[in-house]
Amino acid sequence: TPAVLNTINKYKITKDSKILELGSGEGRDAIFLLDKGYNVLALEYSISAVNKCKELTNNKSPNNFKQFDLMQDTLPGEYDFIYSVAVIHMFVEENHRQKFYNFIHEHLSNTGKALIISMGNGKDEYKSDINTAFNEVERTSININKKVIVASTSCRIKSIPNMLKEIESSNLKVIENKIIEDVPGFDKCCCFIVEKN
């Protein structure tokens, strides 16, 4: 995802920096960064997707991909860069969205940066039925053009002003926000770069 690389370059995230991806899916960004020598831990809810990431890396980096439930699991440590591409919009309930932001705040180093990308054009709002969230479904992997089992998603799209409010209510400071159009598989997305308040 270009925004991940742009943020790494702009904020001078180095190969020695500790990087955390929230919601790695099929591993596109984490695998790319690992291949470039970055120190990445990629967390993903779907065990099938985690196993696919390990397979795609020929199990060279098995400890860099971990099945993880952001709503329940705990993780030690702080990270210099945390990024999440197209994940926050899957959390529909306000308390889940708050847990997501609190998780970032808890694990971001005092000088660290976080990149949060959400579906949406910055203006429209939408909320789906949460009863079908996280059921496993089959889809074609964009990396290998084969069928894989992944977690289906729910969707909550918010306007930029409403996202700014919820991010800042978690003691995070938004230092950049914009609409981007270069996230693979999405039309327009809201992009936020944050740091601890």
Locations of regions flagged by a protein language model:
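A conserved beta-strand element that flanks and buttresses the S-adenosyl-L-methionine
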Residues: 83
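A short glycine-rich, Lys/Arg-flanked "PGG" loop and its adjoining helix->strand segment in the class I
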Residues: 98-110
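Conserved catalytic-core motifs of eukaryotic protein kinase domains, centered on the activation segment
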Residues: 93-95
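Class I (Rossmann-like) S-adenosyl-L-methionine-dependent methyltransferase catalytic domain
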Residues: 1-15, 20-63, 67-74, 113-197
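Short catalytic micro-motifs in class I SAM-dependent methyltransferases
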Residues: 86-90
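Structured loop/turn residues at beta-strand edges in well-structured enzyme cores
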Residues: 77
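Conserved acidic residues
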Residues: 80
